[in-house]
């Protein structure tokens, strides 16, 4: 059976993206993301794929799978699938965004790795928002740390059976 995990960074307001981009830079979160996902399958939506810089697309060291409703969509270096179930064929799969793909994958997930960024970013119309975890999830919260970028952040690890 496939272990499905979700991984994201969010502002304290729950915003994960604005205008097709991540509105902060946190090198420590990028390193954490790389450590968690390296060697595994990563699943993302088309907009997340498009938001990756061309020089790192596909993300190296991982099987990149793009979920798209467009049957003719091409993603050089990645597999394109039409359903989440088609993507869940590896022993460990990490969903990396965006908001719609997180919502589809949440019922399958048993792990969530979350970076909370302490940044004043009120919600606006059109923002991509983090999934809401219900009472079936149990988590461990890390201490607040300071990034080299000057932002404060902390890591959460959530699990459910």
Swiss-Prot record:
Binding of substrate, residues: 7-9, 29, 34, 62, 102, 115
Uppermost EC category: oxidoreductase
Gene Ontology, cellular component aspect: cytosol
Regulation: Inhibited by isoniazid metabolites. The prodrug isoniazid is metabolized to isoniazid-NADP adducts that inhibit the enzyme at subnanomolar concentration.
Keyword set, alphabetical order: NADP, One-carbon metabolism, Oxidoreductase
Pathway connected to this protein: Cofactor biosynthesis; tetrahydrofolate biosynthesis; 5,6,7,8-tetrahydrofolate from 7,8-dihydrofolate: step 1/1
Catalytic reactions of this protein: (6S)-5,6,7,8-tetrahydrofolate + NADP(+) = 7,8-dihydrofolate + NADPH + H(+)
Sequence ranges assigned to domain DHFR in this UniProt record: 1-160
EC number: 1.5.1.3
Gene3D superfamilies: Dihydrofolate Reductase, subunit A
GO BP term, example: tetrahydrofolate biosynthetic process
UniProt binding sites for NADP(+): 8-9, 16-21, 45-48, 67-70, 82, 96-101
Any one Gene Ontology molecular-function term assigned to this protein's record: NADP binding
Functional note: Key enzyme in folate metabolism. Catalyzes an essential reaction for de novo glycine and purine synthesis, and for DNA precursor synthesis.
Family indicated by similarity: Belongs to the dihydrofolate reductase family.
Name of the molecule in the record: Dihydrofolate reductase
Gene source species: Mycobacterium tuberculosis (strain ATCC 25618 / H37Rv)
């Amino acid at each position: 059976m496939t272990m499905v995990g979700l991984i994201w960074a969010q502002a304290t307001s729950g915003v994960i993206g604005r205008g097709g981009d991540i509105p902060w830079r946190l090198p420590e979160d990028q390193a954490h993301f790389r450590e968690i996902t390296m060697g595994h399958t990563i699943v993302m939506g088309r907009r997340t794929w498009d938001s990756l810089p061309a020089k790192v697309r596909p993300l190296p060291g991982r099987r990149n799978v793009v979920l798209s409703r467009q049957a003719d969509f091409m993603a050089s270096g990645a597999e394109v699938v039409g359903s989440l179930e088609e993507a869940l064929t590896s022993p460990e799969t990490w969903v990396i965004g965006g908001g719609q793909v997180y919502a589809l994958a949440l019922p399958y997930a048993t792990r969530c790795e979350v970076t909370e960024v302490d940044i004043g970013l009120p919600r606006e119309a059109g923002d991509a928002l983090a999934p809401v975890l219900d009472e079936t999830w149990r988590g461990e919260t890390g201490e607040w740390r300071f990034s080299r970028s000057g932002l404060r952040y902390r890591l959460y690890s959530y699990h459910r059976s």
